Amino acid sequence: MESENILEAKQVSVAFRIAGKFQKAIYDIDLSLRRGEVLAIVGESGSGKSTFATAVMGLHNPNQTQITGSILLDEEEVIGKTGDSMASIRGSKVGMIFQNPLTALNPLMKIGQQIKEMLAVHDVYPENQYESRIFQLLEQVGIPNPKRVVNQFPHQLSGGMRQRVMIAIAIANDPDLIIADEPTTALDVTIQAQILDLILEIQKKKNAGVILITHDLGVVAEVADTVAVMYAGQLVEKASVEELFQNPKHPYTRSLLRSNPSAETVSDDLYVIPGSVPSLSEIEYDKDLFLARVPWMKEEAQKVISEKMTEISSNHFVRGQAWKKFEFPDQKLKGGKK
């Protein structure tokens, strides 16, 4: 019987070797994803979003990285797999759309050859169908004149076209999970909308699960089913998109939403979150990591320890108890999902 969850991550931690010792970049991550669900992972740069995604893909250097916990892809354990055993999963069960296609694509290989390379790694399609499959993929992602594009190099295409090629490669072998890591960052607004629509169209056709890594809360409000908020390598809140936008609890989630400009912004002054995400050497996972950034909560931060995620209402999880005491000094957050 096919499992409802395409992804189940439990107590996942990733540590990088830095100056001879391992330092945790993400810690104790629990996430699951159903088939057909869009999960958005949000947070500032340095929060650990991409580190988690590359752990799912098995892209970390095993000599410089320690990964613990469990990551099940379609009930198959990923952690511990390397080489050919991981390559058989990557591309067939999970595909990834990277942030910058110009660096992700091989500049010395023609587009058709790069898609063919992905098909050749797996046995999903026989070799005599490679050519027709390549044209089918390019047409599916909205690239005009595929016969011309297969013989072009990445630098000969626009940014939007390169990202469409990346999507074609990611879905070449019909994976059940698609990871989109900031897929529209380098594109203009019009092309951004087209790329997001394309990803969602493919997701619905295949009933695939999608992990969308982004800092754009407007995009999250439009496309996500569930939102996971990360800060300094930890999950701090997880809920349905409606619940999170209408009833945010964790101080970091509330700060992110308040710093996002909208027509409903209460004040003319744009709220700025004080400070920055701590470096790996500064992180103490037994402390509440965000409160130390909030000037009016620093005294409270010394008293509050980091705790496990707690379900405060149906499928709404929040880390620790600090949210019960946190308030902005001037006013309550107003507004919700656009």
Curated annotation (Swiss-Prot):
GO function term, MF aspect, one: ATP binding
Keywords, ordered alphabetically: ATP-binding, Cell membrane, Membrane, Nucleotide-binding, Peptide transport, Protein transport, Translocase, Transport
Keyword Transport: yes
UniProt subcellular location: Cell membrane
UniProt-listed Gene3D superfamilies: P-loop containing nucleotide triphosphate hydrolases
Superkingdom classification of source: Bacteria
KW Cell membrane (keyword) present: yes
Topology class, membrane: Peripheral membrane protein
EC number assigned by the record: 7.4.2.6
UniProt catalytic activity: a [peptide](out) + ATP + H2O = a [peptide](in) + ADP + phosphate + H(+)
BP-aspect Gene Ontology terms: peptide transport; protein transport
Binding site for ATP: 43-50
Annotated GO CC locations: plasma membrane
Domain ABC transporter per the UniProt entry, residue ranges: 7-257
SUPFAM superfamilies: P-loop containing nucleoside triphosphate hydrolases
Alphabetized InterPro entries for the sequence: AAA+_ATPase, ABC_Ni/Peptide_Import, ABC_transporter-like_ATP-bd, ABC_transporter-like_CS, Oligopep_ABC_C, P-loop_NTPase
Family membership: Belongs to the ABC transporter superfamily.
General function of this protein: Part of the ABC transporter complex OppABCDF involved in the uptake of oligopeptides. Probably responsible for energy coupling to the transport system. Essential for uptake of peptides larger than three amino acids and for growth in milk.
Known partners and oligomeric status: The complex is composed of two ATP-binding proteins (OppD and OppF), two transmembrane proteins (OppB and OppC) and a solute-binding protein (OppA).
NCBIfam families for the chain: oligo_HPY (TIGR01727)
Name of protein: Oligopeptide transport ATP-binding protein OppD
